[in-house]
Amino acid sequence: MYAATLELCASSEVVVGLFSSWYVKAACQASGVPSACVHYYPGMIPSRSVPPFGFPAWRWLNPVGWALFSRVIDLAFGSATKRFFASKGLPKVRRALTDVLLSERLNLVATSPTLFPAPADWGALNVVCGDFVPRADQQPWEPEPALAEFLEDGEKPVLFSFGTMAHLAPERARELVLGAVKQAKVRAVVQMRGAEESGRDGDTFFVRWAPHRQLAPRCAAMVIHGGAGTTHAALRAGIPAVVVPFIFEQKLWGRLLQRAGSAAPPLPFWKATPESLGARIREVLGSQALRSRAAALASAVAREDGTGVALGKLEALAPR
């Protein structure tokens, strides 16, 4: 990958990579080409007001949390990256987080600034630009006839999507979702890849895949694991959400939606029961405040242009 990136650098003014693609930074340093990092999660850039990846939201502990987090990153990446950068004659790696995983030129955080305004101490090189989504006409989709009929045949359903997280405990995920649907007495569209069920079963319709951006606006609420994609899908659809985080990263997304006023408190997957999830669904469906706030947030997010902001910053980074 390093050699391939060196070839890319030879014909590029700026190279963009994910924060974890440290070989991109190495190749750019070797070539003298500016590099930018893309982050789909806002909890990787140090700030006094934001907890690090996986840490609790205790603001007074954030400086200590970031020091510990930096040490964890050193243990995970430090030895390998230090050896590699040294072998290429590149600047010495002192801290893997700041010297390898972050760009000293431009970090693009693909998160809605409506949901997560940039912390005041981030400075100009860390930009919350908005999520990257194609225009609707670039991703045309219409539901299959049976799903279209289901969507029109009664009250708007609740959309359930745990993404790839459901594979961590497929049976538990299935029992939790179907039990919650029964407890909440709602119609539901359930997205589960690899599920045995497909099509309509009473008030539930099973799909293996459907684009959240197009399907969510046809639903009353979303029950999601809280990844970047599903979080922004709920936000753009203007519907309230119940976040059921499987891992610690997803807890932050759940807290952000709750803080924004469009979601109930997160309900961790490993503690959730059909009864508790069903009650949480009824809570969001019955809350006019959550529905109104979700609609207002969607209007604000619709005015964002994450791709356009990112392109503008990258163009400014290119040599003149």
What are these regions (language model features)?
Residues M1-V64, T114-L115:
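Conserved nucleotide-sugar donor-interacting segment of glycosyltransferase catalytic cores
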Residues L8, N62-T98, E104-T111, L125, ...:
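Nucleotide-activated sugar donor-binding and catalytic core shared by glycosyltransferases
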Residues V15-V16, A36, L159, V189, ...:
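Structural detector of well-ordered beta-strand residues that form the stable sheet scaffold
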Residues G17-F19, F162, I224:
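Short His-Asn-centered micro-motif
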Residues S31-P34, R105, V186, I239:
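A short helix->loop->beta-strand "cap" motif at the edges of active sites that frequently abuts
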Residues Y41, G194, I247:
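Residues in the short beta-alpha loop(s) of Rossmann-like NAD(P)-binding domains
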Residues I45-P52, D137-P140, A216-R218, L252-G254, ...:
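Short, charged, surface-exposed secondary-structure boundary motifs
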Residues T114-A221:
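Donor-nucleotide binding loops and adjacent catalytic segments primarily
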